[in-house]
Amino acid sequence: MWGDEDYWLTWAELEHCVGTGRTAAEHLFGTEDAFRRYAADARFGAVFNAGMTVLSDTTAAAVVAAYDFSGAGLVVDVGGGQGRRIAAILRANPGLRGVLLDLPSVVAGAPRLLAEAGVAEHCEVVGGDMFAGVPEGGGLYILSRVIDSFDDARAVAVLTNCRHAIGERGRLLLVEPVLPDTVEGLATPTIQADMLMDLNMLVRTGGRERTQAEYRAFLAAADLRLARIIATEGSVSLVEAVPAQASDGA
């Protein structure tokens, strides 16, 4: 995915993106962002989906190891790709049920993957648009490397849909890098990688990586409250949120 010509064409427009705040996809291809580019280009859409599946593999183990899913009941993976992450969660927590939501073209291969993982009977696959709504009734909603793809307005729109679905006792888990407020001296390799990804999101989708304060602010805009941030052994953190009016013990 990273070495595909489409990436290099858009990254060549970095100066334009930094100067205007607009995506290279809009400048080069006349599409708002890379996601619409994926929909219009079947070849690159397949490359992107395969790349995101690999990315899910690299983060799923770290997420499962760092978070206690045992009391969630129903886990809804919003923008969950072809199901690698929800499969890993369900394998590690046999008592849970899952729902996988992503675009119909993305989840087309999910039933086979879930069957191979031995969890197909415990996971419903839903082809849909997270901007139109998300399935209700979950105890835990996960968005992994989803929110960083969007600007604040679109991120809040997705989070608001999750808030409507989550009820008063559910939780939301964002699997994302968390940038430091400031960097003094030489940044660590992880921070350097996160900052590079921040630029990548600007170029490709108009999204961005965010600090703890920025997560707190746009969660509040969606009637959610930042509960805690959990470190993992991988490159991402777990940003856990609850309904704004929930008690600390919810």
Say what each PLM segment does.
Residues 65, 69-250:
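Alpha-helical subdomain
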